[in-house]
Amino acid sequence: MNTAVVSALIAKLTAGCGLVLLLPLLTALFGEEPVLPFIYSMALCFLLAAFLRYKGKKKVINLNPRDGLAVTALSWICISILYLFPYFLSGLLSPLDALVESISGLTGTGATVFADLTVLPKSILFFRSLTHWLGGLGIIVIFVALFPQAGKGSARMIDAESTGPYSSRAVPRIKEMAKALFAVYLLFTVSAALIYTLLGMNFFDAVNHAFSTIATGGFSTKNESIAFYDSTPLKLSVIFFMVISSANFGIYVAAWKRGIRVLWENTEFKVYLSIVAAATILISLNLMLERGLYAPSALLEALFTSASLSSTTGFISYDFEAWPHFSQVILLILMFIGGCGGSTSGGLKVTRIILLFKSMTAVLRQKLHPRAVIQTRAGGENFSESMLLEVFCFFFIYTMSIFLWTALIAASGADIPSALGLSIATMSNSGPALGQFGATCNWSAMPAMTKMVVALSMLMGRLESFTLLILFLPSFWRKNGW
């Protein structure tokens, strides 16, 4: 690994994240709230950036794959640690709790260790939502879009941070694509904030919830989340923005250039919409038959919760802990799958589900016709054996990690259903789980061991395992290669 190059790029990222703290600092100034936690946190960011810049290389032209992975993984770890300080220095959280809150925000998980949001300063509430927005599209993507000075290494870093087996990484002009993705991201955020304001939210709440929605994060300014707002039009608008944020943002760029038909031609997005529709129908029928709800109420409850958990946003409008077990199992499946590759959603990704299904049918056809050459295709694209192997490996790591986290959380005292639900919720970055960690619960009373497990699980889920796990390979740190 080229330590000088990696240090130089992480220095730029940490300095940029220090500048981001100006926004909550200004919020604190205008609201006459404590500003020192943000000033000290900014100082730490700039001091670390200066140290890394001193150790780093002045001019970065290229990155090899290993350096790109190192920059992405280490910058996420570094920024997660730096962003715990506003919480800790405010005297609101312990260091471990502050780290969990920081990681939950940046990874878009959206679960909180705060027991009561109503007592928090507005600057802290805004900072929480801002971490969602920064991590949603991706720290690296936003960095490349605003400060495109990493040379050809930009593609390496974005490749390591991207979600799904294929996404914006396939575009050769990566800097232009990063700018286009950021423009779409910003447009959606501003649109959501304006519509939420028109539908009854105050401006501060609208901005915070817009950050959370488009980043598919889930942090709210209210303890009750979206359930606080008893407004059907508002809930429908939140559903709309959660769903569009679950699609590959690259298709919006393509739709701008080639027309809206691109959206309807995208196989992955159509499959995602079908999954949400099927879950909504099944859950609403279950609620009508077992809970006696009227059809309109059942449909709205089912649609909102299906959109929230499939997009891994995690907003709560209804307590699904009171739902029948059949509906809860469907919600777990939605969290496990998640949204589309190249979106702000977490989870396994619909793309991988499609490829796993296509691979299964290809194997069955190969059994019938042993001499046939069968190519796996999805969305009009051929997938190589190496790509399919990566999908299978990711599926294995994803599921085995969930089982491992379940065992560790259960060892800390949780029952198995609660531990399994929490493991899926953190690996998929969806937030709310089931049982002890359900829709109306927070993580304030969670054992320290469990908090450490979920912190690692959230990071692994956001960086899609490979980027983080590769740091544990001894060969990764050798100077002369693998």
What kind of feature is each model-predicted range?
Residues 1-482:
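Membrane-proximal intracellular helices of multi-pass ion channels
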